[in-house]
Each structure stands twice: as structure tokens, then as C-alpha cells.
């Protein structure tokens, strides 16, 4: 499972997030997406931990918590469903 962390301060770093989530267990990975054109952080992150129970505890404790002056939104990440092709090239039944 992957955790979505939204409403992040643009000052937050991978090390900052690892430190916060380490209180709930071992952090496997942190991803901080950046804007392709500006290189600026986009204000959200994805965190993976070793065990689902650890992730559940982190979500319960951190969702709505204030951190770096922002109220965090923390929940289970949803799989991306768009395939970025639009309708062109999709097989359709006629």
C-alpha cells in the first residue's frame, strides 16, 4: 500500500517526511513529485512503509495534523486510472 500526503509545505524534503513517518515504522520510500517545467515541488508526496499496520497508524495519526504550518491530508493512495491517451486509440464496441 502507498500513502498519499497532500497539502504539504513547499519547503518539505524527503528527509523531513521520512523523519515524521519513521515514528510509525520503517519507511521504504518517499516520492516528492516536481513540476516538469519549473522543478518546484507540487505540494504532495507518496510514502511507502514496510507493513500495512504501520501505514494505517500513520494515516490515522497524521491525517488533519498540522505540520510546517499546513494541515496535512493523509490517506491511502488511489491507483492512477488515466492512461494519458485520451479516447484516441481506445478499442470501442460498435
Swiss-Prot record:
Family annotation (InterPro entries): Nucleotide-bd_a/b_plait_sf (IPR012677), RBD_domain_sf (IPR035979), RRM_dom (IPR000504), SLIRP/GR-RBP-like (IPR052462)
Keyword Endoplasmic reticulum appears in the UniProt entry: no
Domain of life: Bacteria
Gene3D superfamilies in UniProt: 3.30.70.330
SUPFAM superfamilies registered for this protein in UniProt: RNA-binding domain, RBD
Keywords assigned by UniProt, alphabetized: RNA-binding
Protein name in UniProt: Putative RNA-binding protein RbpD
Organism: Nostoc sp. (strain PCC 7120 / SAG 25.82 / UTEX 2576)
